[in-house]
A protein has these predicted regions:
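PAPS-dependent sulfotransferase catalytic domain
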Residues: 83-85, 128-133, 138-273, 285-296
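Short, solvent-exposed loop/turn segments at secondary-structure junctions
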Residues: 52-53, 64-65, 75-77, 140-142, ...
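Short glycine/proline-rich turn/loop motifs
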Residues: 38, 101, 203-215, 302-306
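Short, surface-exposed acidic
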Residues: 268-278, 338-339
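C-terminal accessory extensions appended to soluble enzyme cores
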Residues: 303-341
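PAPS-dependent sulfotransferase catalytic core
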Residues: 1-119, 128, 180-181, 187-194, ...
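Post-kinase regulatory C-tail/linker adjacent to protein kinase catalytic domains
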Residues: 80, 277-285
C-alpha cells in the first residue's frame, strides 16, 4: 500500500515516465513469416554499406537481372525515423495488443504491421517491373550493427548483402561530396579548405596541405571501422548463409563474376548476355554527372568511382591518423599487408 502511495505521489509530481515509452517490439516469428508470405510472396534482400562505398552502383547492377528489382533509400532500418516508428508509441502498443481486440489472438501485432508495410512498398514497385525478387539499397552509416539486428527482427528470412570499400577512398569520397554540396555542416576551417581548393588545387596534391581537418578524419574513419566491424559480425551471426559481403574494388575489377555470385545467392542464374549489360552500366556514372552540375570546379578535381584516389591526396598526417584508427581493419579486408604504406 505504501509503495502505491509513493508511485502515485511520483506521478503527480514528475509525471508517468513509463507512459512515454512502449515495451520492446517483439521479433516476428517463423509462423508469422510463413503466413505473411501467403500475401507477399516475393523473396526479399537488402543492400547495406557505409556511405560512399558503392551501394548505388551495386543497386544499379543487381537490378539488371530480368528477375530482380532493387530500389533505394527506403531506410527501413538504417536511418531515423525508422520503420519501427510506425508502432513505437505507447498508444500503438496499447491498440495492437489490446485484449478486447479479437483480431490479434492475444498477441502484439507490431511485427506484422512493420513487415506488411515494408513488403507492400517493395512488392508494389516490383510488380510494376514484373519481377519476382525485390530488395532495397540503403546506406547504413549511422546505425551500424543495430540496423542488422532491426532488419533481422522483421526479415529473418531475407538476404543481406554488404559492400565494403577501402576506408581511405570512403573518406576521400565523403569529403568531396560535402565540399561539392557546400554542406551546411561545414565549419569555418572546412570553408577555408574549400576556398583554397578553388584557388589552387595543386597545393592539395603535393603533400603540403590536407583537404581534411583532424576532426573530419576521426569522425569518418571511426564510423567506417565501426560500420564494417559491426555489420560483418552481426550479419554472419544472425543471417548465416543468407549474409554475404563483397569489396567494391572487386566489383570494379571483375564485375560479371561478382554479380554472378550475388545473383546465385538470390537464387537466379545469370545469362551470359548480362555481361554486356553490366559493361554498359559501368560506362556511366550518374553521381559524377550530378556533382559536375552542382559544383563543377570542385567536382572536376577528383575522378569519381575509382579506387586509389586517396594516394593523390593523403598527407603524412592523414596517413598516420588513418593507420592509428583503421590500419588493422585495412589489413583484415586485404587492402594492405602491413602498416608501412
Amino acid at each position: 500500500m505504501i509503495s502505491r502511495f509513493k508511485t502515485a505521489a511520483r506521478i503527480l509530481v514528475k509525471g508517468d515516465s513509463q507512459k512515454n515509452n512502449r515495451g520492446p517490439i517483439p521479433a516476428i516469428t517463423a509462423e508469422d513469416v510463413a503466413e505473411i508470405k501467403q500475401f507477399f510472396s516475393r523473396e526479399k534482400f537488402f543492400i547495406f554499406g557505409h556511405a560512399r562505398s558503392g551501394t548505388t552502383l551495386l543497386m544499379r547492377l543487381i537490378r539488371l537481372h530480368p528477375d530482380v528489382h532493387c530500389n533505394y533509400q527506403a531506410h527501413f532500418f538504417t536511418r531515423q525515423p525508422l520503420l519501427r516508428s510506425l508502432v513505437d508509441t505507447p498508444e500503438a502498443e496499447e491498440w495492437l495488443r489490446r485484449k478486447s481486440n479479437r483480431w490479434n489472438n492475444g498477441r502484439d501485432l507490431s511485427p506484422l504491421i512493420l513487415r506488411a508495410a515494408a513488403d507492400f512498398i517493395m512488392e508494389r514497385d516490383a510488380a510494376k517491373e514484373g519481377k519476382q525478387i525485390v530488395g532495397d539499397k540503403s546506406p547504413s552509416s549511422t546505425i551500424h550493427g543495430q540496423a542488422v539486428r532491426d532488419l533481422h527482427a522483421v526479415y529473418p528470412d531475407a538476404k543481406l548483402i554488404y559492400i565494403v570499400r577501402d576506408g581511405r577512398d570512403v573518406l576521400i569520397s565523403e569529403r568531396f561530396r560535402n565540399l561539392v554540396e557546400e554542406s551546411k555542416f561545414l565549419k569555418p576551417e572546412d570553408k577555408r579548405i574549400l576556398e583554397g581548393l578553388r584557388k589552387d588545387p595543386t597545393q592539395f596534391t603535393d603533400g603540403t596541405h590536407s583537404i581534411f581537418t583532424r576532426a573530419v578524419v576521426q569522425r569518418v574513419v571511426e564510423g567506417w571501422v565501426r560500420n564494417v566491424q559491426e555489420t560483418e559480425e552481426e550479419g554472419r551471426r544472425l543471417f548465416g548463409a543468407n549474409y554475404c559481403s563483397l569489396r567494391y574494388e572487386d566489383l570494379l575489377s571483375r564485375p560479371f563474376d561478382e554479380m554472378q555470385r550475388l545473383w546465385n545467392i538470390l537464387g537466379v542464374q545469370a545469362d551470359p548476355s548480362l555481361e554486356r549489360d553490366i559493361a554498359n552500366e559501368l560506362s556511366s556514372n550518374p553521381d559524377e554527372e550530378w556533382q559536375s552540375r552542382r559544383n563543377e570546379d570542385i567536382a572536376s578535381f577528383l575522378p569519381k568511382g575509382r579506387s586509389g584516389n586517396w594516394q593523390r591526396l593523403f598527407t603524412s598526417r592523414d596517413k598516420s591518423l588513418f593507420k592509428e584508427i583503421a590500419g588493422e581493419m585495412l589489413m583484415k579486408w586485404g587492402y594492405e599487408k602491413e602498416l608501412n604504406w
